[in-house]
Design a protein with these regions (language model features):
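Accessory carbohydrate-binding/adhesion or oligomerization-edge regions at the termini
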Residues: 1-19, 97-105, 178
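Short glycine/proline/serine/threonine-rich loop/turn segments at secondary-structure transition edges
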Residues: 48-52, 91-95, 200-214
Length: 384
Protein backbone atom coordinates (compact mmCIF):
# COMPACT_ATOMS: atom_id res chain seq x y z
CA UNK A 1 0.00 0.00 0.00
CA UNK A 2 0.98 3.62 -0.44
CA UNK A 3 -0.08 7.03 -1.71
CA UNK A 4 0.45 7.05 -5.47
CA UNK A 5 1.67 10.68 -5.42
CA UNK A 6 4.78 9.37 -3.63
CA UNK A 7 5.08 6.39 -5.97
CA UNK A 8 5.80 8.45 -9.07
CA UNK A 9 2.24 9.27 -10.16
CA UNK A 10 0.65 12.74 -10.01
CA UNK A 11 1.52 15.29 -7.30
CA UNK A 12 0.50 15.77 -3.66
CA UNK A 13 -1.54 18.86 -2.87
CA UNK A 14 -1.58 20.77 0.42
CA UNK A 15 -4.62 22.85 1.31
CA UNK A 16 -5.65 24.43 4.58
CA UNK A 17 -9.29 25.52 4.36
CA UNK A 18 -10.15 25.40 0.66
CA UNK A 19 -11.05 22.27 -1.24
CA UNK A 20 -8.47 21.27 -3.87
CA UNK A 21 -11.20 21.81 -6.49
CA UNK A 22 -14.07 24.30 -6.95
CA UNK A 23 -16.75 23.60 -4.33
CA UNK A 24 -20.04 22.57 -5.92
CA UNK A 25 -21.35 19.67 -3.84
CA UNK A 26 -21.83 16.88 -4.68
CA UNK A 27 -20.02 17.41 -8.00
CA UNK A 28 -16.29 16.88 -8.48
CA UNK A 29 -14.05 17.92 -11.38
CA UNK A 30 -14.36 16.08 -14.67
CA UNK A 31 -11.36 17.81 -16.28
CA UNK A 32 -8.91 16.76 -13.55
CA UNK A 33 -9.71 13.72 -11.46
CA UNK A 34 -6.88 11.18 -11.62
CA UNK A 35 -7.81 7.50 -11.51
CA UNK A 36 -5.57 4.68 -10.32
CA UNK A 37 -5.92 1.18 -11.79
CA UNK A 38 -4.69 -1.82 -9.80
CA UNK A 39 -4.71 -5.41 -11.09
CA UNK A 40 -3.56 -8.52 -9.27
CA UNK A 41 -3.96 -12.28 -9.62
CA UNK A 42 -4.42 -14.59 -6.66
CA UNK A 43 -5.19 -18.21 -5.85
CA UNK A 44 -7.65 -19.29 -3.17
CA UNK A 45 -6.34 -22.02 -0.82
CA UNK A 46 -8.07 -25.37 -1.37
CA UNK A 47 -8.95 -25.78 2.31
CA UNK A 48 -11.17 -22.67 2.11
CA UNK A 49 -13.76 -24.68 0.14
CA UNK A 50 -17.24 -24.37 1.64
CA UNK A 51 -16.40 -21.18 3.52
CA UNK A 52 -17.39 -17.57 2.83
CA UNK A 53 -14.43 -15.67 1.40
CA UNK A 54 -14.08 -11.95 1.99
CA UNK A 55 -11.97 -9.25 0.40
CA UNK A 56 -10.97 -6.50 2.82
CA UNK A 57 -9.66 -3.02 2.00
CA UNK A 58 -8.54 -1.25 5.17
CA UNK A 59 -8.30 2.21 3.60
CA UNK A 60 -8.61 3.57 0.04
CA UNK A 61 -8.61 7.29 -0.82
CA UNK A 62 -11.08 8.56 -1.83
CA UNK A 63 -13.43 6.05 -3.49
CA UNK A 64 -13.14 2.84 -5.48
CA UNK A 65 -14.83 0.09 -7.44
CA UNK A 66 -13.50 -3.47 -7.38
CA UNK A 67 -14.07 -6.40 -9.73
CA UNK A 68 -13.30 -10.08 -9.23
CA UNK A 69 -12.93 -12.06 -12.46
CA UNK A 70 -14.71 -9.28 -14.31
CA UNK A 71 -17.72 -9.23 -11.95
CA UNK A 72 -18.40 -6.06 -9.96
CA UNK A 73 -17.87 -6.91 -6.29
CA UNK A 74 -18.65 -3.49 -4.87
CA UNK A 75 -18.02 0.22 -4.37
CA UNK A 76 -16.90 2.07 -1.28
CA UNK A 77 -16.23 5.56 0.09
CA UNK A 78 -14.69 6.85 3.33
CA UNK A 79 -10.93 6.75 2.97
CA UNK A 80 -10.31 5.85 6.61
CA UNK A 81 -12.60 2.91 7.28
CA UNK A 82 -12.45 -0.65 5.94
CA UNK A 83 -14.61 -2.06 3.18
CA UNK A 84 -15.52 -5.76 3.29
CA UNK A 85 -16.84 -7.61 0.24
CA UNK A 86 -18.12 -11.19 0.20
CA UNK A 87 -16.58 -12.38 -3.06
CA UNK A 88 -17.47 -16.07 -2.75
CA UNK A 89 -19.88 -16.05 -5.75
CA UNK A 90 -17.23 -14.56 -8.06
CA UNK A 91 -14.39 -17.01 -7.40
CA UNK A 92 -13.24 -19.93 -9.51
CA UNK A 93 -10.75 -22.77 -9.20
CA UNK A 94 -7.16 -21.78 -9.90
CA UNK A 95 -6.12 -18.20 -10.62
CA UNK A 96 -8.49 -15.32 -9.98
CA UNK A 97 -8.10 -11.70 -11.05
CA UNK A 98 -8.79 -8.65 -8.89
CA UNK A 99 -9.13 -5.22 -10.51
CA UNK A 100 -9.56 -1.98 -8.56
CA UNK A 101 -10.37 1.50 -9.88
CA UNK A 102 -9.56 4.30 -7.42
CA UNK A 103 -10.73 7.90 -7.84
CA UNK A 104 -8.73 10.77 -6.38
CA UNK A 105 -11.91 12.82 -5.94
CA UNK A 106 -15.47 11.68 -5.24
CA UNK A 107 -18.51 13.20 -3.57
CA UNK A 108 -17.01 11.80 -0.37
CA UNK A 109 -14.15 14.28 -0.77
CA UNK A 110 -16.51 17.01 0.44
CA UNK A 111 -16.38 15.34 3.86
CA UNK A 112 -12.61 14.84 3.78
CA UNK A 113 -11.32 18.43 3.63
CA UNK A 114 -8.86 18.08 6.49
CA UNK A 115 -5.98 20.57 6.71
CA UNK A 116 -3.17 18.36 5.44
CA UNK A 117 -1.47 16.92 2.39
CA UNK A 118 -3.97 15.45 -0.04
CA UNK A 119 -3.00 12.01 -1.33
CA UNK A 120 -4.72 9.14 -3.15
CA UNK A 121 -4.58 5.40 -3.59
CA UNK A 122 -4.73 2.13 -1.70
CA UNK A 123 -3.09 3.35 1.50
CA UNK A 124 -3.78 0.55 3.96
CA UNK A 125 -3.62 -3.23 3.81
CA UNK A 126 -5.71 -5.38 1.46
CA UNK A 127 -6.25 -9.03 2.27
CA UNK A 128 -8.39 -12.11 1.74
CA UNK A 129 -9.82 -14.16 4.56
CA UNK A 130 -12.22 -17.07 4.90
CA UNK A 131 -14.86 -17.60 7.57
CA UNK A 132 -17.26 -20.48 8.23
CA UNK A 133 -20.84 -19.85 7.15
CA UNK A 134 -21.89 -20.34 10.78
CA UNK A 135 -19.96 -17.62 12.60
CA UNK A 136 -19.97 -14.67 14.96
CA UNK A 137 -21.46 -11.76 13.03
CA UNK A 138 -20.78 -9.08 15.63
CA UNK A 139 -20.07 -8.61 19.31
CA UNK A 140 -20.22 -5.81 21.85
CA UNK A 141 -18.17 -5.88 25.03
CA UNK A 142 -18.73 -3.47 27.92
CA UNK A 143 -16.29 -3.99 30.78
CA UNK A 144 -16.92 -1.40 33.47
CA UNK A 145 -16.29 -1.09 37.18
CA UNK A 146 -18.68 -1.45 40.11
CA UNK A 147 -18.71 -1.69 43.92
CA UNK A 148 -16.53 1.33 44.48
CA UNK A 149 -14.55 0.76 41.27
CA UNK A 150 -13.10 -2.44 42.75
CA UNK A 151 -14.93 -5.16 40.82
CA UNK A 152 -15.25 -5.76 37.09
CA UNK A 153 -18.71 -5.60 35.50
CA UNK A 154 -18.47 -7.79 32.38
CA UNK A 155 -21.24 -7.59 29.75
CA UNK A 156 -20.92 -9.37 26.42
CA UNK A 157 -23.44 -9.54 23.58
CA UNK A 158 -22.79 -11.73 20.54
CA UNK A 159 -24.77 -11.92 17.29
CA UNK A 160 -24.45 -15.16 15.30
CA UNK A 161 -24.76 -15.64 11.54
CA UNK A 162 -26.46 -18.87 10.39
CA UNK A 163 -26.07 -20.69 13.72
CA UNK A 164 -25.98 -24.51 13.60
CA UNK A 165 -28.45 -26.19 16.01
CA UNK A 166 -26.49 -28.34 18.43
CA UNK A 167 -23.37 -26.24 18.06
CA UNK A 168 -21.88 -24.22 20.90
CA UNK A 169 -20.44 -20.81 21.63
CA UNK A 170 -17.65 -20.68 24.18
CA UNK A 171 -16.45 -17.57 26.00
CA UNK A 172 -13.24 -17.39 27.99
CA UNK A 173 -11.60 -14.53 29.85
CA UNK A 174 -7.88 -14.88 30.42
CA UNK A 175 -5.39 -13.00 32.56
CA UNK A 176 -1.70 -13.48 31.81
CA UNK A 177 -2.34 -16.83 30.14
CA UNK A 178 -4.63 -18.18 32.86
CA UNK A 179 -8.35 -18.81 32.30
CA UNK A 180 -10.28 -16.90 34.97
CA UNK A 181 -13.75 -17.35 33.46
CA UNK A 182 -15.32 -19.82 31.04
CA UNK A 183 -18.88 -20.30 29.81
CA UNK A 184 -20.47 -22.39 27.05
CA UNK A 185 -23.88 -22.05 25.48
CA UNK A 186 -25.55 -24.58 23.19
CA UNK A 187 -27.29 -23.28 20.08
CA UNK A 188 -30.86 -24.54 20.25
CA UNK A 189 -32.17 -23.59 16.79
CA UNK A 190 -31.32 -21.86 13.53
CA UNK A 191 -32.95 -18.71 14.91
CA UNK A 192 -30.86 -18.73 18.10
CA UNK A 193 -28.71 -15.83 16.96
CA UNK A 194 -28.22 -13.85 20.18
CA UNK A 195 -25.84 -14.70 22.99
CA UNK A 196 -25.61 -12.52 26.12
CA UNK A 197 -23.34 -13.07 29.09
CA UNK A 198 -22.84 -11.10 32.30
CA UNK A 199 -20.30 -11.78 35.02
CA UNK A 200 -18.87 -10.02 38.06
CA UNK A 201 -15.10 -10.24 38.44
CA UNK A 202 -14.08 -9.45 42.04
CA UNK A 203 -10.99 -7.36 42.78
CA UNK A 204 -9.85 -6.91 39.20
CA UNK A 205 -6.93 -4.75 38.05
CA UNK A 206 -8.44 -1.69 36.33
CA UNK A 207 -7.14 -0.16 33.11
CA UNK A 208 -5.92 3.42 32.86
CA UNK A 209 -3.14 5.25 31.03
CA UNK A 210 -0.70 4.77 33.92
CA UNK A 211 -1.43 1.09 34.51
CA UNK A 212 -2.92 -0.35 31.30
CA UNK A 213 -3.93 -3.74 32.70
CA UNK A 214 -5.37 -5.89 29.95
CA UNK A 215 -7.35 -9.10 30.00
CA UNK A 216 -8.11 -11.26 26.94
CA UNK A 217 -11.53 -12.29 25.69
CA UNK A 218 -11.53 -15.53 23.67
CA UNK A 219 -14.67 -16.43 21.69
CA UNK A 220 -14.88 -19.83 19.98
CA UNK A 221 -17.62 -21.56 18.01
CA UNK A 222 -18.11 -25.32 17.49
CA UNK A 223 -20.42 -27.40 15.32
CA UNK A 224 -22.80 -30.08 16.63
CA UNK A 225 -20.00 -32.69 16.54
CA UNK A 226 -17.72 -30.53 18.65
CA UNK A 227 -15.43 -29.55 15.79
CA UNK A 228 -13.92 -26.08 16.18
CA UNK A 229 -15.25 -23.67 13.57
CA UNK A 230 -13.64 -20.38 14.52
CA UNK A 231 -11.89 -18.61 17.38
CA UNK A 232 -10.80 -15.01 17.93
CA UNK A 233 -9.38 -12.89 20.73
CA UNK A 234 -10.02 -9.34 21.93
CA UNK A 235 -7.73 -7.70 24.51
CA UNK A 236 -9.69 -5.43 26.86
CA UNK A 237 -9.48 -3.64 30.16
CA UNK A 238 -11.96 -2.92 32.92
CA UNK A 239 -12.51 0.84 33.19
CA UNK A 240 -15.32 3.34 33.67
CA UNK A 241 -15.88 6.71 32.01
CA UNK A 242 -18.35 9.23 33.41
CA UNK A 243 -19.07 12.95 33.56
CA UNK A 244 -19.56 14.48 36.99
CA UNK A 245 -19.66 18.17 37.97
CA UNK A 246 -18.28 19.16 34.59
CA UNK A 247 -15.33 16.78 34.82
CA UNK A 248 -14.56 13.59 32.95
CA UNK A 249 -13.71 10.82 35.38
CA UNK A 250 -11.77 7.66 34.56
CA UNK A 251 -12.38 4.96 37.17
CA UNK A 252 -13.85 7.60 39.45
CA UNK A 253 -10.81 9.88 39.25
CA UNK A 254 -10.69 13.25 37.48
CA UNK A 255 -8.04 13.07 34.76
CA UNK A 256 -5.98 15.93 33.35
CA UNK A 257 -5.66 15.09 29.67
CA UNK A 258 -2.23 16.01 28.33
CA UNK A 259 -2.63 15.13 24.72
CA UNK A 260 -1.80 15.72 21.09
CA UNK A 261 -3.47 15.62 17.71
CA UNK A 262 -1.88 12.96 15.53
CA UNK A 263 -2.17 12.64 11.76
CA UNK A 264 -1.30 9.48 9.88
CA UNK A 265 1.52 10.84 7.74
CA UNK A 266 4.85 9.46 6.60
CA UNK A 267 7.31 11.61 4.60
CA UNK A 268 8.16 8.72 2.28
CA UNK A 269 4.89 6.79 2.03
CA UNK A 270 2.22 9.43 2.60
CA UNK A 271 -0.80 8.06 4.41
CA UNK A 272 0.70 4.57 4.79
CA UNK A 273 1.99 4.07 8.33
CA UNK A 274 3.94 1.14 9.75
CA UNK A 275 3.42 -0.40 13.17
CA UNK A 276 7.07 0.39 13.95
CA UNK A 277 6.44 4.11 13.39
CA UNK A 278 3.32 3.94 15.57
CA UNK A 279 5.36 2.47 18.43
CA UNK A 280 7.98 5.21 18.01
CA UNK A 281 5.22 7.83 18.26
CA UNK A 282 3.92 6.26 21.45
CA UNK A 283 7.38 6.01 22.98
CA UNK A 284 7.96 9.70 22.23
CA UNK A 285 4.61 10.63 23.77
CA UNK A 286 5.34 8.61 26.89
CA UNK A 287 8.79 10.22 27.13
CA UNK A 288 7.10 13.62 27.40
CA UNK A 289 4.42 12.40 29.83
CA UNK A 290 1.54 12.66 27.39
CA UNK A 291 -1.49 10.53 28.17
CA UNK A 292 -4.02 11.24 25.39
CA UNK A 293 -4.27 11.29 21.59
CA UNK A 294 -6.94 12.54 19.23
CA UNK A 295 -7.14 10.61 15.96
CA UNK A 296 -7.34 13.82 14.01
CA UNK A 297 -9.32 13.91 11.94
CA UNK A 298 -10.41 10.40 11.01
CA UNK A 299 -10.35 6.81 12.22
CA UNK A 300 -6.80 5.44 12.30
CA UNK A 301 -5.44 2.05 11.36
CA UNK A 302 -6.85 -0.53 13.75
CA UNK A 303 -3.35 -1.45 14.97
CA UNK A 304 -3.03 2.02 16.51
CA UNK A 305 -5.94 1.35 18.85
CA UNK A 306 -4.47 -1.96 19.97
CA UNK A 307 -1.17 -0.24 20.77
CA UNK A 308 -2.93 2.49 22.78
CA UNK A 309 -4.69 -0.26 24.74
CA UNK A 310 -1.35 -1.94 25.40
CA UNK A 311 0.84 1.07 26.20
CA UNK A 312 -1.82 3.16 27.92
CA UNK A 313 -3.07 6.22 26.02
CA UNK A 314 -6.55 7.73 26.24
CA UNK A 315 -8.11 8.09 22.80
CA UNK A 316 -10.50 10.58 21.24
CA UNK A 317 -11.79 8.66 18.22
CA UNK A 318 -12.85 11.04 15.46
CA UNK A 319 -15.15 10.43 12.51
CA UNK A 320 -13.89 11.20 9.02
CA UNK A 321 -16.07 14.29 8.66
CA UNK A 322 -14.56 17.65 7.80
CA UNK A 323 -16.06 20.11 5.33
CA UNK A 324 -13.90 23.12 6.17
CA UNK A 325 -14.05 24.47 2.63
CA UNK A 326 -17.82 24.91 2.84
CA UNK A 327 -17.36 28.04 4.97
CA UNK A 328 -16.67 29.93 1.73
CA UNK A 329 -19.71 28.36 0.03
CA UNK A 330 -23.13 30.02 0.06
CA UNK A 331 -24.57 27.11 2.08
CA UNK A 332 -21.91 27.42 4.78
CA UNK A 333 -22.21 23.80 5.92
CA UNK A 334 -23.36 20.38 4.76
CA UNK A 335 -24.63 19.51 8.23
CA UNK A 336 -28.12 20.86 7.47
CA UNK A 337 -28.43 19.51 3.93
CA UNK A 338 -30.82 16.51 3.87
CA UNK A 339 -28.87 14.93 1.00
CA UNK A 340 -25.86 14.52 3.29
CA UNK A 341 -27.52 13.02 6.36
CA UNK A 342 -26.84 9.41 5.31
CA UNK A 343 -23.12 9.96 4.52
CA UNK A 344 -22.70 11.74 7.88
CA UNK A 345 -24.39 8.87 9.71
CA UNK A 346 -22.50 6.15 7.84
CA UNK A 347 -19.14 7.67 8.72
CA UNK A 348 -20.00 7.99 12.40
CA UNK A 349 -21.83 4.70 12.86
CA UNK A 350 -19.27 2.60 10.99
CA UNK A 351 -16.49 4.05 13.12
CA UNK A 352 -18.32 3.39 16.38
CA UNK A 353 -19.26 -0.16 15.38
CA UNK A 354 -15.67 -0.91 14.39
CA UNK A 355 -14.08 0.61 17.50
CA UNK A 356 -16.60 0.25 20.33
CA UNK A 357 -14.68 -2.62 21.96
CA UNK A 358 -11.49 -0.56 22.36
CA UNK A 359 -10.82 0.17 26.04
CA UNK A 360 -8.56 3.17 25.32
CA UNK A 361 -11.37 5.18 23.68
CA UNK A 362 -12.85 7.54 26.26
CA UNK A 363 -14.46 10.09 23.89
CA UNK A 364 -16.20 9.93 20.53
CA UNK A 365 -15.72 12.89 18.18
CA UNK A 366 -18.26 13.54 15.43
CA UNK A 367 -15.75 15.29 13.17
CA UNK A 368 -13.90 18.55 12.77
CA UNK A 369 -14.51 22.02 11.31
CA UNK A 370 -17.78 21.22 9.59
CA UNK A 371 -20.00 23.93 11.01
CA UNK A 372 -23.06 23.21 13.10
CA UNK A 373 -26.20 21.50 11.89
CA UNK A 374 -28.95 19.01 12.68
CA UNK A 375 -26.95 16.07 11.30
CA UNK A 376 -24.59 16.35 14.26
CA UNK A 377 -27.55 16.21 16.63
CA UNK A 378 -28.61 12.99 14.87
CA UNK A 379 -25.10 11.55 15.21
CA UNK A 380 -24.97 12.49 18.88
CA UNK A 381 -28.31 10.87 19.65
CA UNK A 382 -27.39 7.66 17.80
CA UNK A 383 -24.01 7.36 19.48
CA UNK A 384 -25.46 7.91 22.96
Amino acid sequence: PGSWELQGFDSPIYTDVAYPFPANPPHVPTDYNPVGAYVREFTVPAHWKGMDIFLDFEGVESAFYCWVNGELAGYSEDSRLPAHFNITPFLKTGKNKLAVKVFRYSDGSYLEDQDYWKYSGIERDVYLYARPQSRVQDFKLVAGLTNGYKDGDFNLNITLHKPHPGGTVEVKVMNKGNVIYQHKKEITSATDTLFAQKHLFPAILPWNAETPNLYTLVVSTYDAQGKALESFTQPFGFRSVEMRNGMQLINGVAVLFKGVNRHEHDPHHGRTITVESMIKDIQLMKQFNLNAVRTCHYPNRYEWYALCNEYGLYLVDEANIESHGMQAHKDGTLANNPDWEVPFMQRMSRMVLRDRNITAIVTWSMGNESGYGKHFETLYDWTK
